[in-house]
Amino acid sequence: YLSELMDPPARLSVAGLQQLASLEREQAAALRSAWPQIEAERRRQVVHLLMELAEDNVDLDFAAVFFAALEDEDAAVRADAVRGLWEYEGRDLIAPLLRLLEKDEEPEVRVEAALALGRFVVLSELVSLREEHFQQVEEGLRRALEDELEVDEVRGRALEAIGASDRPWVEQAIQAAYESEAPRLKVSALHAMGRSCDGRWLPVLIEELANDDPEVRYEA
């Protein structure tokens, strides 16, 4: 099906795209090699359609395609690739996500990477992730959160992601974000309070249900 992907006039069909599911190692390698040769708009279409197919049928595993797309030169493709891996819990995804969070030039991609790393924070709390792996995730999210040169959207999403952790510094970070003058950080702090499942935040959340800002009320 690679030849059809590389041929812009060729129509993308569901049957054809399904051939990209559960690729063997050699097939995945061939895809990674051919991927940059596919025109940008076509790559955007492919990744978006694969996301839709995977949502409709959870048995379809397009991880190999999404992994290849994480390296795409197009930011929209990279962001969609991260979204497409929303159910993937393999530890081999941690390093690529951290790289995107720390080095990607586009805030949209960094936001998606931060949110995706939150999955591994939850796995750690469920004792389903080794400590060494969690430490990598924790350090990456903390760097993003504490980077005052980073945009608030990314910092806020990093806080939301780490919010499920019971590390002492996380509670302090949530409180600091809640008290900050940055609206995005306050909203993310409320989201993180919910993810923490910590009863100490309940009075704050109840109080914010009466906030004039609909986004604040929604998160509360």
What are these regions (language model features)?
Residues 51, 86, 118-122, 163, ...:
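Structural signature of alpha-helical solenoid repeat scaffolds
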Residues 23-36, 56-71, 90-103, 123-146, ...:
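Amphipathic alpha-helical scaffolding segments comprising HEAT/armadillo-like alpha-solenoid repeats
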Residues 11-14, 44, 48, 64, ...:
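Alpha-solenoid HEAT/ARM repeat scaffold
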Residues 1-56:
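N-terminal alpha-helical scaffold/docking segments in eukaryotic complex subunits
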Residues 10-11, 25, 40-44, 60, ...:
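Alpha-helix N-cap/helix-start positions at coil->helix boundaries
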Residues 1-21, 76, 80-102:
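Glycine/serine-rich loop-strand microenvironments at binding/catalytic pocket rims
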